[in-house]
Design a protein with these regions (language model features):
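Aromatic- and acid-rich polysaccharide-binding/catalytic face
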Residues: 156, 160-164, 215-241
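Aromatic-lined carbohydrate-recognition surfaces of secreted/lumenal glycan-active proteins
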Residues: 76-88, 146, 159-166, 176-215, ...
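Active-site-adjacent "subsite" loops/lids of carbohydrate-active enzymes
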Residues: 2-5, 10-12, 79, 84-148, ...
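Boundary/entry segment of secreted carbohydrate-active catalytic domains
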Residues: 1-17, 25, 202-206, 266
Length: 307
């Protein structure tokens, strides 16, 4: 069974943190880490297209060190890029960099019914600022960013997250429903051309019907067309029976595509997580991936030791 971790960008800001990540992975037989290097339209790597992430110290290149450190210990590094989700701020502040696409190209941003993009549309369900999936220039920029990453860095794979609309209320035409898949389709061509053999993966809503109807994420279509090599349905539930139901349904929707069951690593609930890893395997998943790596709760990674 494949064992993998999602690693959020705030856990890779120093060499020491990355070295600790690799040590934690190797001691538990974890050979794949999916690491967030494009979180909010910014770069945790050296980029000519997007600004350096705010708060990233000095001239440190996290992705370069990840690739080197992973190669030294046999851990495969997958670069994780948020696709349409490009900014969020609890205070409603804009990015500091004038080069950030939110500042450079506000015309690319998704709006609903004329509402300003910084206003919380949908109350507590509002996630942040998205680019409009229908906007061809925005899609082109995003694909150029992803291609830059896989060209410059010897990553094992590229991982899409937020490859969807925030809510179906933003969509009202057939073009809306095709826009997300248009990016995934073009991405498959470009990333595979830039780095032959690359593993293209996506984090997806686990129920394919809800994914289609609520956020216009038609991931079973991507699987059938071989646009992705690996799917990670995010079955984030404490109810293990519900996790089993969701992963079984996901497996049936894409029976020929490699799949890792996405599980929430709830703090202090190691027994629950161990049961859910077992459930993912029973549902037919080739592996499990935990959200998310946290050195403060590294004991949760021990669930993989017995898997």
């Amino acid at each position: 069974m494949d064992k993998a971790l999602w690693v959020v960008r705030d856990k890779i800001t120093t060499k020491g943190a990355i070295d600790d990540l690799m040590a934690d992975a190797t001691t538990r037989g974890i050979h794949d880490v999916v690491v967030q290097v494009r979180g909010r339209g910014d770069a945790y790597y050296t980029s000519s297209l997007e600004p350096r992430a705010e708060g990233l110290p000095g001239d440190f290149d996290p992705l370069a060190h990840l690739v080197r450190a992973g190669a030294a210990v046999g851990v495969r590094v997958h670069a994780w890029g948020n696709v349409f989700f490009v900014w969020s701020s609890p205070e409603g502040a804009l990015p500091k960099s004038a080069k950030h696409l939110v500042n450079r190209h506000p015309e690319w941003l998704l709006r609903s019914g004329g509402v300003k993009y910084l206003d919380p549309v949908g109350g507590s369900d509002w996630e942040g600022i998205y680019t409009d999936p229908r906007n061809a220039e925005a899609r082109e920029h995003t694909l150029a960013v992803f291609t830059e990453i896989v060209t410059r860095y010897r990553v094992e794979g590229f991982h899409y997250d937020y490859v969807r609309y925030p809510q179906a209320t933003y969509a009202d035409s057939p073009e809306d429903h095709a826009a997300v898949t248009a990016l995934v389709s073009e991405g498959a061509k470009r990333l595979r051309a830039a780095r032959p053999g690359i593993v293209i993966s996506a984090a997806v809503f686990p129920d394919p019907d809800l994914a289609r109807d609520r956020v216009l994420q038609r991931w079973p279509d991507w699987a059938r067309a071989s646009l992705v090599d690996l799917l990670c349905p995010m079955a984030y539930r404490r109810d293990t029976a519900e996790v089993a139901r969701l992963l079984t349904k996901a497996r049936a929707a894409a029976p020929k595509t490699r799949m890792w069951g996405g599980l929430m690593a709830y703090a202090s609930e190691r027994a629950l997580l161990r049961d859910q890893v077992r459930v993912a395997e029973q549902a037919g998943c080739e592996g499990a991936i935990l959200f998310a790596y946290d050195p403060a709760h590294r004991d949760l990674l021990d669930v993989f030791s017995a898997a």
